[in-house]
UniProtKB/Swiss-Prot annotation:
Covalent S-S links between cysteines: none
EC number: 6.1.1.15
Name of this chain's protein: Proline--tRNA ligase
Pfam families in UniProt: HGTP_anticodon, tRNA-synt_2b, tRNA_edit
Gene expressing this chain: proS
Organism the protein comes from: Legionella pneumophila (strain Paris)
Length: 569
């Protein structure tokens, strides 16, 4: 591609509304342009990168024998009403009506559509298992879209769906797709982790997220330093501590704590550490109006874990102070588990405390030297807390460390959630109708582009991994407009590299060298070749890698093979 015939528009200044590096650099390099809130046009340069991502994904999906199709973006409300998600998906579902007042949504995902297709197309176990994927535009009506294409309202996603009759078959396909995702991100040159994850609104029995590691990532990931264990903050657990192995010999004592309401205030007032206290949170229950969740004072409640307990209502709902005071006759800052006449669920780490300080269920009073069993009863012990850096890994191997990541892929074992709701069944080997079970496998095409930039950039611009770069090589002829020799040699080099299937940009614009070099660094082309009269007199071409500040001279007759070898490494 010749730059003089290409739409190459870069910006020196960083846009004011761009918060993170990928958003800034995608705008400055001319990859994207904003149309509206969370809506972006992919300009020619950005589209080249996007297509490379799609091609890698498509190749690896095809290797798993998944079949590509394309489903409508606009979906009828009836399908979503069958599964109940029309009401439960929330405000991110963009709904509309046609001229006949029929309701539709712009699909944020396609479980309902693919299940509807398969319940009509599949009749027999002989047709299973099957796996279909698409690369399609989605829309989620984010309240506050931000970070450019990282959290846009409209985005492109690869979503795949598999159908099975047995759990073993589902697990086999799940493993194949998991490995395909690993190959995809390996080919893209990304540093990532596959982590255990919550199934969230999609549902299902098991799931893994693929997280690109980046300091700007919104997700917290915990991983063991001595094993393969890794999970996001919602799912991460630590080694369960043993119960206190010795009884508390101190007498439980009621003390005054005037106007001390928070854990930190109580601990400071009593001259103790917060990890010597426990806190009691009152939430809505499934079968009971209220349920108490008890944690060690220095721990944070993991709301996702809490809602998985059979006694806790989902979504999690905290009881307001007025209702607590009216029902339990205790102000919020003085609640504790002793003689609390509602179900009490205790976190394992709180249960491991031989003694503790807790609210006395009287205004401005706390108990010290309280102990489980002797003083406080509970209904169940459960994992309720967010793990912390330094906790022991749940597999007993190593300690947990924390890093940040950007979720770019998510695979789920859905089970029969959607097939059962939509009566998607086939005749099994015994001649009976059997509900199918499903797997779901999503990958954010547009988000991968932004995540790659977050991981690969410097103060000058993008540093593309070779597989994603819009161009692999940039040839810059210096004074090519005035020197016929430079112009001809640059053209010859351009044609030779093209003939070997290499993506080459010939930057033949009539600009100063500094502008051409700065644009190359901003755009992030991995390999730069500079053709100049001075170097040609020595029979050389100047080479510079985007990852290095050093330049080197390559013999003219060796430069093509030199580039080919670099690209094929």
């Amino acid at each position: 591609m010749r730059a003089s015939q290409w739409f190459l528009v870069t910006q020196k200044e960083t846009p004011n509304d761009a918060e993170i590096a990928s958003h800034q650099l995608m705008l400055r390099s001319g990859m994207i342009r904003k149309l509206g809130s969370g809506l972006y046009t992919w300009m020619p340069l950005g589209l080249r990168v996007l297509r490379k991502v799609e091609n890698i994904v498509r190749e690896e999906m095809n290797k798993t024998h998944a079949m590509e199709l394309l489903m409508p973006s606009v979906q009828p409300a009836e399908l979503w009403q069958e599964t109940g998600r029309w009401e439960t998906f929330g405000g991110q579902l963009l709904t509309m009506k046609d001229s006949n007042q029929r309701e539709y949504c712009f699909g944020p995902t396609h479980e309902e559509v693919i299940t509807d297709i398969m319940r009509n197309e599949l009749q027999s176990y002989k047709q299973l298992p099957v796996n279909f994927y698409q690369i399609q535009t989605k829309f989620r009506d984010e309240i506050r879209p931000r970070f450019g294409v990282m959290r846009a309202r409209e985005f492109i996603m690869k979503d795949a769906y598999s159908f099975h009759l047995s759990l073993e078959s589902l697990q086999e396909t799940y493993k194949d797709m998991y490995q395909a995702y690993c190959r995809i991100f390996d080919r893209m040159g990304l540093k990532y982790r596959a982590v255990e994850a919550d199934t969230g609104a999609i549902g299902g029995s098991a799931s893994h997220e693929f997280q690109v590691l980046a300091e700007s990532g919104e997700d917290l990931i915990f991983y063991s330093d001595a094993s393969d264990y890794a999970a996001n903050i919602e799912q991460a657990t630590s080694l369960k501590p043993p119960k206190a192995n010795q009884a508390c010999n101190e007498t439980i004592t009621l003390v005054d704590t005037p106007n001390q309401k928070t854990i930190d205030e109580v601990a400071s007032f009593l001259g103790i550490a917060s990890n010597q206290t426990i806190k009691t949170l009152i939430v809505k229950g499934k079968e009971h109006p209220m349920v108490a969740l008890v944690l060690r004072g220095d721990d944070e409640l993991n709301e996702v874990k809490a809602t998985k307990h059979p006694l806790v209502h989902s979504p999690l709902s905290f009881i307001d102070e007025e209702l607590i005071l009216k029902t339990l006759k205790t102000p919020l800052g003085s609640i504790g588990p002793i003689q609390l006449n509602i179900p009490v669920i205790v976190d394992h780490h709180a249960l491991a405390m031989p003694s503790f300080v807790c609210g006395a269920n009287q205004a401005d009073k706390h108990f010290i030297n309280a102990a489980w069993e002797r003083d406080a009863k509970y209904d169940d012990a459960y994992d309720l807390r967010n793990v912390k850096e330094g906790d022991q890994s749940p597999d007993g191997r190593g300690t947990l460390h924390c890093c940040r990541g950007i979720e770019v892929g998510h695979v789920f074992q859905l089970g029969d959630k959607y097939a059962k709701a939509m009566n998607a069944s086939v005749i099994n080997e015994q001649g009976q109708l059997q509900t199918m079970i499903m797997g779901c496998y999503g990958l954010g095409i547009t988000r991968v582009v932004a995540a790659a930039i977050e991981q690969h950039h410097d103060e000058h611009g993008i540093i593309w991994p070779q597989a994603l770069a819009p161009f692999q090589v940039n040839i810059i002829p210096l004074n090519g407009a005035r020197s016929q020799t430079v112009k001809e040699q640059a053209e010859s080099l351009y044609q030779q590299l093209k003939s070997h299937g290499i993506d080459v940009l010939l930057d033949d614009r009539n600009e100063r060298a500094g502008v051409l070099f700065a644009d190359n660094d901003l755009i992030g082309i991995p390999h730069r070749l500079v053709v100049s009269e001075r170097n040609l007199e020595q029979g050389c071409i100047e080479y510079k890698s985007r990852t290095s500040s050093e330049t080197q001279l390559i013999n003219l007759d060796k430069v093509v093979n030199f580039i080919i070898e670099l690209i094929n490494k």
